[in-house]
Each structure stands twice: as structure tokens, then as C-alpha cells.
Amino acid sequence: NKMPNCLRLIVSGLSALFFLFPSLAAWAYGTDEYPSLWESDDSRLQKQLVATLSSLGLGKAVQNKKLSVAVVDITDLDRPRVAAVNGNQMLYAASLPKIAILLGAFVEIEEGSMALDSRTRESLTQMIRVSSNQEATRMLNRVGKERLLGILQSDKFHLYDPEVNGGLWVGKEYGKSAAFHRDPLHNLSHGATAMQVARFYYLLETGRLVGDNLSTEMKSMLGNPGINHKFVKGLADYPDAKIYRKSGSWRQWHADSALVETGDHKYIIVGLAEDVNGGAWLSHIIKPIHELMVPTKLAAVSH
């Protein structure tokens, strides 16, 4: 049976549109059965997030775009609930984008271009848990600087996408050397948006970064954080909370990101702040957010 001319024109037009703008296809359909976080807004959670930040005296910081926060309930992976303030605001994020180097390394490992031997595993773990700049630079160069940026911007990941104001970017070694490629939208050397970082954790948890076995390896490196500040410090009163995270700080820029698990409940939280007190802000934010995301009987402080 022949397709009617009008239908053929529509189909060919859509195909051309998605060919020219591949990220539009990803936006419309997602990469598979999981929904887009940008299409998973939860109005109740949004009101709770805004009220929480206001109660902490952070409303002005949000208004002035000095604070970005994204919270995603992924207890049901098929139905994420999203709330964010300045979620697409791209800020300097210091060491947080080392998660992008982690991804780049695991993509290379999955493709057989890099071996996950004991030295590589230790290097990646040190880069994440204690934020080693030396190991981050070592792994960045092993992956390849432009290769990493290509991975972040690829049709598979879209972790840096101009259509959503950027995202994760690593355009400089973690050391004194000059930037080799600043991000094209904001001229940042190490940047992130809260929503794109949240997507990183959602993609990881749903097995869409790399295969299951390597996803488990990646997640283990994000676990057992070696630096007790920001979100980790704020969750110290909740011993049942397991946290998988990467943070960053430099001068007045403070960032943290985490996948938090308590019982059967899981949520992602990302905070990016530009203020000398930003680290303290993040420690204060996580407590009421945790109690919002986890039922009271589970979140209660153990005695």
C-alpha cells in the first residue's frame, strides 16, 4: 500500500527535523522508555522546595541566580518527580564536573579503549572520593580532552546541550594550566547546571550511561565519600542514609551533587552556589529536603 502524499510529506518533514536537530528527537521521545526530567515537574514538590529555601533565608539568592537547586524523587524510576530553582542556570562548579571525567573513562572502558585495572580503578576512586586534582588531570588526558567533550555533547548523552543552556563541561585540566576549551555559551572552564547533573545520576541509576556491571563500578566510586562537608555534613544525623556524591569548591563557588538512598526511597539532589557561605547553604538545605523526600519514621534521627 502506498502512503498518501500528505502523510509522506509529514513523515519526511519530521525525519528531516530530527536529523537536523537530534536533541529535539531526544527531547520529544527520550532515549528509551524513561521520561525526560524536563517533562517530569511535580507542582507539590516544587512548592515545597521553594518554601524550604525561603524558610532558610535563601529566597534572595535564588532570585539573584546565585543558587541553583534540583531535587528528583526517583523512588519509582519510571516516574521521577522533579523540582528545581534556576535548574538550567550554568555556574562554575569547580571539582563537581569530575563526574564527567568518570563517565568518559567508563565509556572508554566499555568500548575496550581503556582497561579497568587496579591502577585505573584507584585513580578514578581518588578523583571522586577525595577529589584528587592530580588523578583528575591524569584521567582527563587518558580519555582525551576533546574526546571527553565529544562524549558530553553526543546524541547518546546530551549532558552538554545548548537547547537547555549547557550542562556538564570540562575545558581545563585540574591544575595551573590554562583552559584548553571553554564552554561556548558561558566561557566556563569547569561548569554545570543542576538539571544536567541530576540527569547524570538518573542516567546512571537507570543503566543508561554504561552497562550494568560498569554502572555498579561507577556508583561504588561515588559512594563512601572521603570529604565531610556540604551534603555529607548535613546528612550526618541520618545514619541510614547512603550517599553517592561529588562536590566542588573554589573561592566563592560551592557545589554538591548526590544520589541519596534510605530504605526503599531514592532521590537526587544538586546544589550550585556562588557565595562565600555557599558551602554552609548546602549543608542546611539537605536536612529539610531529606525529610521531605523520606517518610518521617525513616528519616528520624537514630538514638
Predicted region positions:
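Bacterial N-terminal signal peptides that target proteins for export
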Residues: 2-14
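Bacterial N-terminal signal peptides
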Residues: 12-22
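Structured C-terminal helix/loop/strand segments within mature extracytoplasmic catalytic/sensor domains
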Residues: 28-53, 189, 199-303
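A short, well-structured edge-of-sheet supersecondary motif
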Residues: 48-86, 261
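Acidic helix-start/capping segments at beta-turn-to-alpha-helix junctions
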Residues: 67-75, 118-133, 141-145, 167-169, ...
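Active-site SXXK
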Residues: 90-114, 127, 269
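Short, well-structured active-site flanking segments
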Residues: 107-125, 211-214
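Mid-domain, small-residue-enriched loop/turn segments at the edges of structured enzyme/sensor domains
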Residues: 139-206
